[in-house]
């Protein structure tokens, strides 16, 4: 039951009636601008619409005059109890009380299915996230993007999309050459040789394990092998070991990908060449000289002829180079080939999660996808910002002297998976987030995950102590009449819209904010019961009032449970 959609459909129906009477002008363009939403201020009613404002540009009347015309029909919408028009022409609605009581009944009948909406209609969507370089275990800096991508995938599945979770393995390029050289040193160390780790190599002690693994399997044979052969062996063993390590770290976060795509395999299968040929056939490739990039020093830049992609034809700021001076492909060329591969696998809708330092790739990648798909495919790029790790307000040192970083495993052992997953979604993804190890284990309202879980646990405690109650159909919910009870019901009614808008905007943090708001409203209501026995959920000798209040409490639990499950977090029945 999405109240906004219900009222919006009624408004559209009434607008068509007025259009048929020639009182207004209506078309699809006007309807596409129609807004029905919850106001930011409770004093402005329960819902508002901009209908009069969008119609005024097509009729020689002011928005306030048009609003008066609309009222003649809007007042007949049964869900609306009163209407108020405010300048410059917004129409505010108050919703009839019976609708709010139906919300409580509906939640208890549908339970966690109350917010089930189908906006995806089974459409395939590819969500690529994490895609960390396979050069070491995942440090905690990777967690935010990993959790964001996984929760977004859960959310899209809830609203009817067929989701494929994908990880792009960057197993080609300089960083892998450096990895292989670093591991070879650790292998030599395992054979008993003294080593010196030069600058530019990976110093992490975790590479010792790969060196030992190679020594156990090959003894000293690698020392005698040809350079090409031993480098291939070291590369294959290192990548397998490190990808298994990454998968284990992701599993600790509750994350599992469906598909792993290798950059090296794409290059081996000449996907870049096929992609470039397609762009050439579309006359989107040319050879030219780019202007000097802003911020570069003259001595570091020389004009040169390069193979360029006409990305400006598709909204980019400049055309993009596809080949380096030595003839090898640029990172961007490899990246558009990878998205060409996704398109070839039938994905018309792709979502890519990247760190905010990749903001420069947004326009060029969108341009490439448009070009490769004849504008039939889209890529939505979601950026995540950094995380400041604190311990009671003091910055936590992220790196160790060994060259290793604070890992996902370290943090999960300290505070638990569910805490990490929830806290990483307490800010919009492109905003810097503070993660305070002391705060996230506090049992107080200052700790959002505790506050939400405590609300759910309180309802579960209530249910364990509750007497037998009336059936939903036999309960008169009109006894829920206090201001706080009605405000809580109105908040619960927003849940289907919160889910739908979170999915449409690819912003799961909206759910976090909402769950915190629900928990706060419930704790306030609980607090009134501690002060006044008549405000408690269980009232002796009044089975109807008790039933109504318990159904209200259960509504809170169903919605919190539903929200936490989108996050792959287990709702707690008892606080520990």
From Swiss-Prot:
Its EC number is 6.1.1.19. It comes from Ehrlichia chaffeensis (strain ATCC CRL-10679 / Arkansas). It catalyses: tRNA(Arg) + L-arginine + ATP = L-arginyl-tRNA(Arg) + AMP + diphosphate. A motif ('HIGH' region) lies at residues 132-142. GO terms for cellular component: cytoplasm. It holds the Pfam family Arg_tRNA_synt_N. One of its GO terms (biological process) is arginyl-tRNA aminoacylation. Belongs to the class-I aminoacyl-tRNA synthetase family. SMART domains: Arg_tRNA_synt_N, DALR_1. This is Arginine--tRNA ligase. The gene is argS. Keywords: Aminoacyl-tRNA synthetase, ATP-binding, Cytoplasm, Ligase, Nucleotide-binding, Protein biosynthesis.
């Amino acid at each position: 039951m999405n109240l906004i959609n219900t009222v919006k459909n009624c408004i559209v129906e009434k607008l068509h009636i007025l259009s048929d009477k020639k009182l207004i002008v209506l078309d699809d363009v006007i309807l596409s601008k129609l807004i029905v939403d919850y106001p930011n201020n409770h004093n402005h009613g329960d819902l508002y619409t901009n209908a009069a404002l969008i119609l005024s540009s097509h009729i020689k009347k002011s928005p306030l005059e048009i609003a008066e015309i609309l009222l003649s029909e809007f007042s007949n919408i049964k869900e609306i109890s009163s209407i108020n028009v405010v300048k410059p022409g917004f129409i505010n609605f108050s919703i009839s009380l019976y609708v709010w009581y139906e919300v409580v009944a509906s939640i208890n009948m549908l339970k966690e299915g109350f917010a089930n909406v189908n906006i995806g209609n089974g459409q395939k969507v590819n969500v690529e996230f994490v895609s960390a370089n396979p050069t070491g275990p995942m440090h905690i800096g990777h967690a935010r993007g990993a959790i964001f991508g996984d929760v977004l995938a859960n959310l899209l599945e809830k609203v009817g999309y067929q989701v494929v979770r994908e990880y792009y393995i960057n197993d080609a390029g300089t960083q892998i050459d450096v990895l292989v050289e670093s591991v070879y040193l650790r292998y030599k160390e395992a054979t008993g040789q003294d080593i010196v780790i030069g600058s530019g190599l990976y110093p992490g002690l975790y590479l010792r394990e790969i060196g030992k693994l190679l020594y156990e399997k090959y003894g000293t044979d690698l020392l005698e092998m040809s350079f090409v052969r031993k480098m291939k062996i070291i590369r294959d063993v290192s990548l397998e070991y490190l990808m298994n390590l990454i998968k284990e770290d992701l599993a600790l976060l509750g994350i599992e990908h469906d598909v792993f795509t290798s950059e090296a395999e794409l290059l081996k299968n000449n996907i870049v060449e096929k992609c470039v040929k397609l762009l050439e056939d579309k006359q989107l490739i040319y050879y030219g000289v780019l202007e000097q990039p802003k911020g570069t020093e003259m001595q570091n830049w020389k004009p040169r002829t390069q193979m360029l992609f006409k990305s400006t034809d598709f909204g980019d700021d400049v055309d993009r180079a596809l080949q380096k001076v030595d003839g090898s492909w640029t990172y961007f060329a490899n990246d558009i080939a990878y998205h060409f591969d996704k398109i070839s696998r039938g994905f018309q809708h792709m979502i890519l999660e990247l760190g905010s330092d990749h903001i420069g790739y947004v326009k060029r990648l969108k341009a490439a996808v448009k070009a490769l798909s004849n504008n039939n495919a889209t890529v939505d790029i979601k950026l995540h910002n950094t995380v400041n790790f604190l311990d009671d307000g003091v910055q936590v040192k992220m790196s160790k002297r060994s060259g290793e970083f604070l890992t996902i495993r370290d943090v999960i052992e300290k505070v638990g998976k569910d805490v990490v997953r929830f806290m990483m979604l307490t800010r919009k993804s492109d905003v810097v987030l503070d993660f305070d190890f002391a705060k996230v284990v506090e049992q107080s309202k200052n700790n959002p995950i505790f506050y939400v879980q405590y609300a759910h646990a309180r309802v579960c405690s209530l249910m364990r102590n509750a007497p037998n109650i009336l059936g939903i159909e036999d309960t008169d919910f009109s006894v829920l009449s206090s201001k706080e009870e009605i405000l809580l019901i109105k908040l619960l009614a927003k849940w289907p819209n919160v889910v739908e808008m979170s999915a449409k905007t690819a912003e799961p943090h909206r759910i976090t904010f909402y769950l915190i708001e629900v928990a706060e409203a419930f704790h306030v209501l609980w607090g009134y019961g501690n002060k006044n026995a008549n405000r408690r959920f269980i009232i002796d000798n009044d089975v109807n009032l008790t039933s109504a209040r318990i159904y209200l409490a259960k509504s809170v639990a169903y919605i919190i449970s539903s929200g936490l499950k989108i996050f792959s977090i287990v709702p707690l029945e008892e606080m520990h």
